[in-house]
Each structure stands twice: as structure tokens, then as C-alpha cells.
Amino acid sequence: MSRIGKNPVPVPDKVTVSLDGLTVKVKGPKGELERTLPEGVSVSQEANTIVVAPTSTKRISRERHGLSRTLVANMIEGVHNGYSKALEIVGVGSRAQVKGTTLVVSAGYSHPVEMPAPAGITFKVENNTRVIVSGIDKELVGNEAAKVRAIRPPEPYKGKGIKYEGEHILRKAGKSGKK
């Protein structure tokens, strides 16, 4: 049995969960999420907790047990508190701004790069160099933050580029030159 999967998921007071087979709908103060869990697990609601259990002892069922429990926990956390990921823009002349729901990044290219926000995601910019991606779906927030970082990944010599807040960039020494 999965060590993560065997723990029940607590449901806060302001969150409602409805189950329909393997489809889980979670509604909370920040919004509503729906997801179909993979085959091989069963989901049940007991009092203020959600319990995920494997349907058999097959390997695939045991593998999906912990995954399914974490997916449900992330959905509940998302509609209750939400998720956010911060990125820092390092480099002279590199900056970001928000126009409507579109993030516009000037990252050293000949043109500014525009990223429209998908449904459920909001971009916020502080001091022109700090971008905050927020939303209720953890997977979507992480994917959009990765797309922003991919515009100009940090380079190892001077560290210029877009990096996650708190990310450590491995630095390389430059050429040593002739002596």
C-alpha cells in the first residue's frame, strides 16, 4: 500500500466535494475543478475526508494509488487557497508587463514576447522584473510558469534570463585566456 495514498485527504469547511465514479468535482471559494482519476483506484467520501484506495493488488493499481490521492489533495488545496509560482527576470533591459490578460516580456530579443493567459491563470508583475503566475490548478500554474521561463532560460556564465524565485543557477567560469 502506498504510504502517501493511505492517508485520507481532509476537506476544509468551505469546500464541497462530489464524486461520480472516478470523476471528482471540487468546489470552493476560489473556484471549481473537475478531474477524472485513472483506472485502478476507488474514491469514497467519509465525513470530512476523502479516501482513495486501490481496487486490486496489481502493480499499476498500486502505482496510481498515491498519484490519485495527491491529485485530489491538490484540487482541494487549489480551490481553498490557490497556487502561485514566482519568477525573476535577470539582465539589463529585460522586463515584463501585463496588458489585459497578456504577459509581455522583453527578454533581449528583437521583439517583445507575448503570452496570453489561459483560462484559470492570472499573471501579475512587480517591479518589472518579478512575474507571479497564479491560479487554482497546480498543474496548469506549473506549466505556464515553465513556459514563461522557457522564453529566456538562465544562462550559466552571467546568470541572465528568467528563473524561478529561489532557483540556484550553476555558474561556469569563462575562458581563461592566454598567458
Curated annotation (Swiss-Prot):
Family recorded in the similarity comment: Belongs to the universal ribosomal protein uL6 family.
Gene name of the encoded protein: rplF
Name of the molecule in the record: Large ribosomal subunit protein uL6
UniProt-listed SUPFAM superfamilies: Ribosomal protein L6
GO molecular function: rRNA binding; structural constituent of ribosome
InterPro entries with a match to the protein in the record: Ribosomal_uL6-like (IPR000702), Ribosomal_uL6-like_a/b-dom_sf (IPR036789), Ribosomal_uL6_a/b-dom (IPR020040), Ribosomal_uL6_bac-type (IPR019906), Ribosomal_uL6_CS (IPR002358)
Subunit architecture: Part of the 50S ribosomal subunit.
Function (record text): This protein binds to the 23S rRNA, and is important in its secondary structure. It is located near the subunit interface in the base of the L7/L12 stalk, and near the tRNA binding site of the peptidyltransferase center.
Database matches in Gene3D superfamilies: Ribosomal protein L6, alpha-beta domain
Gene Ontology process terms (BP): cytoplasmic translation
PROSITE patterns associated with the record: RIBOSOMAL_L6_1
Cytoplasm listed as a keyword: no
UniProtKB keywords: Ribonucleoprotein, Ribosomal protein, RNA-binding, rRNA-binding
GO annotations of cellular component type: cytosolic large ribosomal subunit
